[in-house]
């Protein structure tokens, strides 16, 4: 996507890197002051059976490993939440083509974008809702970031805030000890 700032058009580029740090501790996460750092625990089990971030514009969350298969858009979708993007309110987008990145699971789409193209639209027991692998980042997603309102220094702007929440492995805590996340999938 592109954005226009002070009558100049720029190509939007997100540089995303990752590292595996199984021994990272809560204090290191809580004390983070680098806006480039995001913290996501990735585990086999998640209470609620879904990946999530801790809130809009945050920098931490919890991913269910099953959601991160090759071709999955879950990480990009959750990253959108960390940048402050909401789920759209109209969740029946039949006739509107390819779903944008921020549409959640359960969105009603044209058959070719469903888990099961033969299922009745909206039948979430038989695959009649959007398969997340079909979501794409679209120019309108970039516009929703309102990048033209950021303060830029040396060509860089900061999008999002710090939540810096350390998450325990959900397999080690009961569902009553689990704090319900603010933003789902």
Predicted regions and their residues:
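Metzincin-family zinc-dependent endopeptidase catalytic domain
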Residues: 1-95
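Metalloprotease/metallohydrolase-associated module, dominated by Zn2+-dependent proteases
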Residues: 61-70, 89-185
């Amino acid at each position: 996507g592109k954005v226009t700032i002070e009558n100049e058009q720029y190509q939007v580029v997100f540089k995303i890197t990752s590292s595996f740090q199984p021994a990272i501790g809560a204090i290191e996460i809580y004390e983070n002051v680098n806006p480039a750092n995001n913290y996501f625990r990735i585990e086999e089990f998640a209470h609620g059976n879904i990946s999530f971030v801790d809130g809009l514009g945050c920098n931490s969350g919890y991913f269910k490993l099953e959601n991160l298969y090759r071709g999955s858009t879950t990480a990009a979708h959750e990253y959108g939440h960390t940048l402050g993007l909401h789920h759209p309110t109209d969740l029946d987008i039949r006739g509107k083509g390819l779903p944008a990145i921020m549409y959640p699971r359960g969105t009603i789409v044209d058959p070719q974008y469903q888990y099961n193209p033969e299922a009745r639209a909206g039948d979430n027991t038989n695959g009649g809702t959007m398969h997340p692998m079909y979501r794409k980042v679209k120019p309108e997603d970039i516009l929703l970031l309102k990048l033209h309102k950021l303060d830029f220094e040396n060509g860089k702007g900061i999008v999002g805030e710090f939540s810096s929440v350390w998450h325990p492995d959900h397999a080690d805590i009961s569902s009553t000890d689990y704090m319900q996340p603010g933003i789902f999938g």
